[in-house]
């Protein structure tokens, strides 16, 4: 379990380098416009999403029970990090859908990782992001999103990425770098 969580954390570290507003009952898709919302810092204090509206965001929203999804993609990102002053990347741990891992233990691990790597890692103990953005079912999912500065979802994937999705991810990254 710890190995899986650490692998997810590496994903978050690697990452650092329009539609209508979503109602809670809708499912977000590419083109959906989302609003600033809150998640929690590693000490469980509510915080707004960093740089929302100021930079394009690359968000890894991961269920730690299934953090090994997309391991080949994660390895590829480790080799070819996304580097741009226009894109801010961070991870969010979906605590609500990880009943086998006590939230306090996960937060402690996140705090250690943040201190060691200076990675931006947040937690979502109650589906705050999922509900605010209408992400639908995120249980057992590795969710990867690219959100433009104006709040438009430019890329959204849940679960294992296909080759076509990986190609699309990099295409959108290049678009957002400009």
What positions do the PLM features span?
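Short, internal strand/loop/helix patches
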Residues: 90, 107-140
């Amino acid at each position: 379990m710890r190995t899986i969580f650490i692998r997810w954390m590496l994903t978050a570290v690697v990452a650092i380098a329009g539609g209508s507003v979503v109602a809670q009952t809708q499912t977000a898709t590419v083109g959906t416009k989302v609003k600033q919302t809150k998640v929690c810092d590693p000490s469980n204090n509510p915080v707004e999403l960093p740089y929302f509206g100021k930079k394009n965001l690359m968000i890894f929203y991961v269920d730690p029970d299934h953090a090994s999804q997309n391991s080949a993609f994660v390895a590829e990102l480790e080799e070819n990090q996304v580097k741009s002053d226009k894109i801010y990347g961070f991870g969010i741990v979906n605590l609500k859908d990880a009943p086998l891992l006590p939230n306090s233990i996960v937060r402690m691990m996140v705090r250690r990782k943040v201190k060691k790597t200076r990675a931006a890692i947040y937690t979502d103990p109650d589906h705050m992001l999922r509900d605010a953005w209408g992400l639908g079912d995120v249980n057992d999912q590795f969710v990867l999103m690219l959100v433009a500065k104006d709040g438009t979802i430019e890329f959204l994937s849940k679960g294992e990425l296909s080759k076509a999705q990986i190609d699309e991810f990099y295409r959108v990254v290049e678009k957002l770098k400009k």
